[in-house]
Amino acid sequence: MKLLLLNILLLCCLADKLNEFSADIDYYDLGIMSRGKNAGSWYHSYTHQYDVFYYLAMQPWRHFVWTTCETTKGNKECYKYIINEDHNLNAQQLNNIKNLDKQDFCQKEYAYPIEKYEVDWDNVPVDEQQIESVDINGKTCFKYAAKRPLAYVYLNTKMTYATKTEAYDVCRMDFIGGRSITFRSFNNENKDFIDQYNTNTTSKCIIDVHKNNVNTHLAIILGITDSTVIKSLQEKLSVLSQLTTVDGVTIYYLKGDSYATDNIKLKDLKYETLVKYTAGQGQVDPLVNIAKNDLFKMISDKKIKRGTMVVLMDNALGSEFNAETEFDRKNISVHTVVLNRNKDSKITYSALKLVSLGPHYHEFTSNSEVSTTIDELFKGIRANLTERCDRDKCSGFCDAMNRCTCPMCCENDCFYTSCDVETGSCIPWPKAKPKAKKECPATCVGLYECKDLEGCVVTKYNASCEPKVKCMVPYCDDDNNLKEVCKQKANCEADQKPSSDGYCWSYTCDETTGFCKKYKHGNLCTGKTTNCQEYVCDSEQRCTVQEKVCVKTSPYIEMSCYVAKCNLNTGMCENRLSCDTYSSCGGDSTGSVCKCDASTGNQCKCNKVENGNYCDSSKHEICDYTGDKPKCIVSECTEDLVRDGCLIKRCNKTSKTTYWENVDCSNTKIEFAQDGKSETMCKPYYSATCLNGQCVVQAVGDVSNVGCGYCSMGTDNVITYHDDCDSRKSQCGNFNGKCQPNGDNSYSCVFEKDKTSSKSDNDICAECSSLTCPADTTYRTYTYDSKTGTCKATVKPTPSCSVCEKGKFVEKCKDQKLERKVTLEDGKEYQYNIPKDCVNEQCIPRTYVDCLANDDNFGEIYKFYLPCQAYVTATYHYSSLFNLTSYKLHLPQSEEFMKEADKEAYCTYEITTRECKTCSLTETKEKVEEIDLCAEETKNGGVPFKCKNNNCIIDPNFDCQPIECKIQEIVITEKDGIKTTTCKDTGKTTCDTNNKRIEDARKAFIEGKEGIEQVECASTVCQNDNSCPIIADVEKCNQNTEVDYGCKAMTGECDGTTYLCKFVQLTDDPSLDSEHFRTKSGVELNNACLKYKCVESKGSDGKITHKWEIDTERSNIDPKPRNPCETATCDQTTGETIYTKKTCTVSEEFPTITPNQGRCFYCQCSYLDGSSVLTMYGETDKEYYDLDACGNCRVWNQTDRTQQLNNHTECILAGEINNVGAIAAATTVAVVVVAVVVALIVVSIGLFKTYQLVSSAMKNAITTTNENAEYVGADNEATNAATYNG
């Protein structure tokens, strides 16, 4: 049992992604177990420190399966540990399970991998006091951040990374995306239960482990050159020689400007062999492509079944791979081993693109991790060489670990099922004798068969039994008499609940249509007196009233303290504590007064809460909120009496039901100006209505356009009509308004076009339209409406990446190309083009380009290299800032990418030598051709040459072998008729050709160019008297701190074409320069706020020097705040500006306000001048705020505004003092709020309905500030309650 992972483990069918589970087992897996619909309890043993799932009500999926191997006295034995609660054995038989033939305990068909979830300690507070506590099922649990796919995990123990322990239970898991799994109560489990459970349900099953059965070829790319780890790697890679199905190994490594390969036997994969290969520095992309092609050819030729590639690398790749299309579909498995000392995300990102499965990726940072990393590599390769999935036979799908899996969790209404790993389909379980969930006996009607999702259905009717229409069904008086003649009856069920018309109906079969139709009904359903009653139909279609029956739901099923009750207010069933008959009725406390947890000994107990006011339903008490204060009253009704705006709930004592009364506003007087027009014109537009419990006069229509004018209500509540048509101008066209009579004796203000105007509707409307490019009639057409003086527009979709120029939409990206030039081997410039595409409304260079394509863009280059394209490496360079995720999600690229995208899109071409053949200029130096270097040597000197390891050497079978690379020729002399053969020095060497090659290459590179740095880094070296290859010495290309090349720096690489050291131009990136010059200029590399530029100068002696200066235009040295209510600083890590909101507290800025008064206000920064202003809270979902006449804050329950949530404070006025002057003197809306509140506090009196004025002013202030894009609203009651708790 100790193998059940000490980390947080969970199995949940719904949590799986399709490709994340398998129905097979092998000893390379972490572990696997079965699943069911219903997650069970979690048990954690403190004594043995292991986790156990205990499944409840899960048939037959109550199984754990995990595998392991043990070596005893030199014998390796692999077995499965199985927990199986549905088997045919007794406890005694479990001890002898190996020797039992007929047993269904050790089944493998129902096995799925467990999932491992972990706490994200990096995001857990180090201070235990900061860890949030949560009540879950009556238990106090603690919230911890968790790694994907979880968002949070809740444990019953409070701990930090420093104090973490294994002694915890899991309460709940929250998944990213919103799904949660809550674990059931498990207070009664103990060690005895666990021991008994293990004894009866757990056993060890011996298995035959799947042997490796896939023959493969191993391609190893040596791309790690770090001297501190290379020896350990070479020693540890010998472990791969234990792979039993590998038929050969090919080593690939960079060598100079080219590469080298060598084929070795698997047994020679050891340190003594690998030490012979010295890998060059650089990106291994070309080697990956070459190895991929080599392996794919072996697969195509049926020499191997699968290719295996191991990529050792310590540099980011120069290009991006698609693992699925480039490797998986070609049956090649790629495994990466990455040395990433500084955890560079760019290296990780590019290396991950090579693999399609997490276990195939291995990253380490130091020499101490080499052994563990290569062991994991070995396990990953070995697991992948066992094939249990044939794509031609698997009806499910082959997952990433090459196993046939079922497309979903197996569920069937008729049989217990499992996943058949051979076919990937769900089959009855177990195979030998399937267990049926439902039996379907034969009757006189016919033969029945159980079908998934349907149940028992007739598969074959007996004679005269098949129904004539859908609504008839055959039956027999005696089901056991299979010879009885069938009878037919209507298959129409009567109502169990009343229909929508309020009656209970029975139904009969309409033999014409085949559908059921209404037949008879009983009495009308009446008599419900509470929400917890419901209407039910009996067999005689009589409607009766019954009390609702509630049933406990998960996770409360096993909790004895909880019962299912109907809520009288809502009519909904709830899981509530059995002793809880209390409901809140005002007061300071709104929580429950009852508990059932460890503090009450897991018994249901209720205690009065201080300052709480609760009504007891067992005493027929309800809460009456309709008076001045909420109070409990004994009532015949069961619902609380509340006020809701203009409605008041009352109790009918006779019927024992509640009803609503409306506030009557029919007698409210509406006043009009006595001018003979106002009442006639405006009366239809105003009426009296109830608002916030008061009768007010409100407009009920659009009063801004009444007849030829408008209506308005003055401060004296008198309504007046204003005729202003003649002074109006149309919104579009600026036409004069004219009052015209309508056919119904009414009048309208119209705006006819000037008869003298020759402008069309499109011309008129384009001038007042807010659309982009309004005058482009291809995409915008208009119609002028004289009744409103406005225009209606018809808009067509505009082209992508278009802008408005001279009134027309112009497609900016259409047919755009970047013109590029490149100088090729003949010294001529060739032009090529890189097309640009519109992607997500951005015009960017095409993301993929074939730089050797035979098309209009690269045609000239294609023709030039056509004779020998096999030796040309064409690379498309693209900006490293390109975000592939944004591209796939149809999101725009960053501004930084757009700035450099065009500049960073170009092609490079490089000629390489393979097997002593290369691409070279012809004698005319106008074309290139394929040449065999060894054939040239033979032709020129008459001495036979052969190719070995990409170098030309004199044929080993030639009689006159060279001495110290000096070429000798055969001389035949004759004396006395006897011929004598001797060797004579020719004065030539095997180095001559390569020496000339170096000389010509440097000459061609330097010719016609000035100011080129020339540091030679390659020469010929005589090897074994015969071979004379070009050897690069990269040490010469390491930047010397004493040498200043100006704004250029050595890259540490030797150019394989020119045999000179490569230089990089220094412009704005000091990280490319040596530390000596960075320190000399005071460069801060870790400060992203500072950007630099390289400045070059020339001394009187002609010597060029350089230094780094801060580029003030690009640097973010002194960021500015966007408004007066924030400060701005630069983040030195990202270089981004950080804006911090200015904060203020009510108690500090307004010390004269008491806590009770301050409960309604929060302190806010003014966007006008940055000063602090007092602002009243707006309404929230839970709370509503106002002030009494003394300025005291009143917080009301939003759903019941008669219920005050804070302490009530009596207001006693000394007298009425008019405070209008203080308000009138205020200059801004925000200051009005301050003036009103301060006046209330200092004078200790209030204005009538002052809180309405304050609230209105506050809302206006927020409306104004919302126009500022950087405005962020407060958290309403949360912020204020934290400051004032009085």
UniProtKB/Swiss-Prot annotation:
Q: Which GO terms describe its molecular function?
A: carbohydrate binding
- What task does this protein carry out? Lectin which binds galactose and N-acetyl-D-galactosamine of host glycoproteins and thus mediates adhesion to host cells. Mediates adherence to host colonic mucins, an essential step for pathogenic tissue invasion.
**GO BP annotations listed:** cell adhesion
Q: Which organism is it from?
A: Entamoeba histolytica (strain ATCC 30459 / HM-1:IMSS / ABRM)
The UniProt keywords, alphabetically, are: Cell adhesion, Cell membrane, Disulfide bond, Glycoprotein, Lectin, Membrane, Signal, Transmembrane, Transmembrane helix
Q: Which residues lie on this side of the membrane: Extracellular?
A: 16-1227
| Designated name of the protein | Galactose/N-acetyl-D-galactosamine lectin heavy subunit 2
> What PTMs does it carry?
N-glycosylated.
Chain ranges on the Cytoplasmic side, renumbered to this chain: 1249-1286
Per the record, the major location class is: membrane
- Provide the Gene Ontology terms for cellular component: plasma membrane
Localization, per the record, is: Cell membrane
Give the disulfide map.
none
For this protein's source organism, the top of the classification is:
Eukaryota, Amoebozoa, Evosea, Archamoebae, Mastigamoebida
Give a yes or no for keyword Ion transport in this entry: no
Which residues are sugar-modified?
N200, N331, N384, N462, N652, N883, N1197, N1207
Give membrane topology per the record: Single-pass type I membrane protein
Query: What residues form the membrane-spanning segments?
Result: 1228-1248
Asked if the record carries the keyword Nucleus, the reply is no
Spell out the subunit comment: Heterodimer composed of a 170 kDa heavy subunit (hgl) and a 31/35 kDa light subunit (lgl); disulfide-linked.
Q: Residues of the signal sequence?
A: 1-15
